Amino acid sequence: MINGVYYNEISRDLDISSSTQCLRFLKETVIPSLANNGNNSTSIQYHGISKNDNIKKSVNKLDKQINMADRSLGLQQVVCIFSYGPHIQKMLSILEIFKKGYIKNNKKIYQWNKLTSFDIKREGRNELQEERLKVPILVTLVSDSEIIDLNLHSFTKQ
């Protein structure tokens, strides 16, 4: 039995088995704290991926998102792809297929990754033993140009 889901050592009211609820939490709470867009000079498109997503539809959606026409407003276009736990493998497959198709068209792509985690506390065999698990969260930012307006100090450039 799970006693609680924690992020940054703060208890969150999340059901870790509900991908919709967790992906919404990542989009609304976790990602804004990681990629600070303080001056709003970057247009960020979000794409949460679960293991049930269709690869072809997701790749097409990513392609549309990265080519959006917000540049006319002087905004830099960034796509934020994110997932957690058992969904990360599907996310990586979709991301690599998307990048392969994008680079195939002689376009350059820039990528930044951030790995963080949820902490889960489970009941042990007795009340004195508590089991702690980490559920990984992967956040990836991709753009067709260098990201200069986001605070990416915690991200690793790919």
Swiss-Prot record:
The keyword tRNA processing belongs to this UniProt entry's keyword annotation: yes
UniProt miscellaneous comment: Present with 3180 molecules/cell in log phase SD medium.
Role summary: Component of ribonuclease P, a protein complex that generates mature tRNA molecules by cleaving their 5'-ends. Also a component of RNase MRP, which cleaves pre-rRNA sequences.
Organism: Saccharomyces cerevisiae (strain ATCC 204508 / S288c)
Gene Ontology molecular function terms on file: ribonuclease P activity; RNA binding; rRNA primary transcript binding
Catalytic activity: Endonucleolytic cleavage of RNA, removing 5'-extranucleotides from tRNA precursor
Keyword terms, alphabetized: Coiled coil, Hydrolase, Nucleus, rRNA processing, tRNA processing
Major location category of this protein: nucleus
An example Gene Ontology CC term for this record: nucleus
Localization per record: Nucleus
Coiled-coil parts of chain: 51-71
Keyword Lyase among UniProt keywords: no
Lineage of the species this protein comes from: Eukaryota, Fungi, Dikarya, Ascomycota, Saccharomycotina
InterPro entries in UniProt: DNA/RNA-bd_Alba-like (IPR002775)
Enzyme class: hydrolase
Protein's name in the database: Ribonucleases P/MRP protein subunit POP6
Subunit note: Component of nuclear RNase P and RNase MRP complexes. RNase P consists of an RNA moiety and at least 9 protein subunits including POP1, POP3, POP4, POP5, POP6, POP7, POP8, RPP1 and RPR2. RNase MRP complex consists of an RNA moiety and at least 10 protein subunits including POP1, POP3, POP4, POP5, POP6, POP7, POP8, RMP1, RPP1 and SNM1, many of which are shared with the RNase P complex.
Record-level GO BP terms: intronic box C/D snoRNA processing; maturation of 5.8S rRNA; nuclear-transcribed mRNA catabolic process, RNase MRP-dependent; rRNA processing; tRNA 5'-leader removal; tRNA processing
EC number: 3.1.26.5
Pfam families, alphabetized: Alba (PF01918)
